[in-house]
Structure formats: structure tokens, C-alpha cells
Amino acid sequence: MGNKISPTSFRLKITDTWKSKWFSKLNFADMLQEDVRIREYLEAHLKKAGLSRIDIERLNDGTITVIIKTSKPGLIIGKGGAGIEELKKRILSKLGIKKEIKVTIEEVRDINMHAQIIANQIAEQLEKRMAFRRLMKQTLEQVMQAGAKGVKVAMGGRLNGAEIARTEHTSAGKIPLHTMRADIDFARATAFTTYGTIGVKVWIYKGDIFEDKK
């Protein structure tokens, strides 16, 4: 069962928490749709900013707080915070959201321990026609050297321009998908190549959440 569903949702409230933190009895569908649109917009327009995670919180007065975790905060903040103000204006105008929005930037330091950053980097290199096997090998080495206890990378599509699509995967260390206390960071990304799209999945095992108590 553990290897058939998202490792993140499988361990919610154990090793991770929800990316959207709010509650609504009446306008749940509309708010959820707004969250999806905000995330899609930010992921599309901040590709080079090293995005790791986007959390969205809402207050009772309707204020939306967007927390962006990134390895390159300077690219988003801009000079004197001008980048954040411009980003807020674009979200309000392009998505048609008529609510107050606050944007908070949090820096991610150890980029090789964040699955989303790694997945995005792989997708970017695939779009530049880098050999997928070389990418896999480099990724395993980088993540394991950063202190991970295990890493797995899977790619699916017309790899290296092959006529028939296939899925390739490789791993190092261990990935205990059935252990609920295992802190596993999971992420997906899509590479848009001249041969079609290539799906990328990354699992990073950081250890058990109870290890410090043993």
C-alpha cells in the first residue's frame, strides 16, 4: 500500500502537515480553487527561484497568506522588497482574486535535501537534453552526500528521444515506504522536451522522526 499512494499524504500529521491551512463550511470549493490557481501561477512564474514548497493560510477576515519556501529568496524579494509587491499585484490582477494577500518568503538552505527542488532541477536539465542516466547518477551522489539515508529517482516518457516511452528508476540507500514514522520527502515535476513530456519523481528519506528519542 505504501508504494501506491503519495508518501506525503500517507504520513500527514506524522512527518508532515497540510499545505493549505484554513477551514470553511460554505465556500470550501471556491477557496480550494483559489489555492490551486495561486500555486499553479507561482510554480509557472518562479521556476528559476528554487521553489521547495508553497503553503497557504487564511484568516477569518479573508486575508490570504502565501508562504513561499525557496533556495533563492533574492530573486523573489527583489530590491527593497519590490519583487514581493509586484508579485502580489500580479496574483490579484491575473487570477482575479479580490482579497488581501500577504506574501512571506522563507529561505531553504540545504537544497539537496528537498525533493521538490531536486525534481525541478532534473526537469530543467532534461529540457536541456542532458542524458537521463547521467542525471540520475549525479542526483543520487548529491543527495546522499548531503546526509540523506536514501534516495530514489524515477523518470517516465520518451527518454533520450526513444520511440517507445518507458519508465526508468534508480535508488541509493533505503526508502521504507511502509514505515509511517519514516520522514520521506516526495515530489513530482514535468520536463517539456521536443519529444514530449517526461515525468520526474523523487523520494528522499531523511530518517525516522523518533530517532532522536532512541
Regions picked out by a protein language model, each given a short descriptive name:
Residues M1-K214:
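RNA-contacting regions in translation and RNA-metabolism proteins
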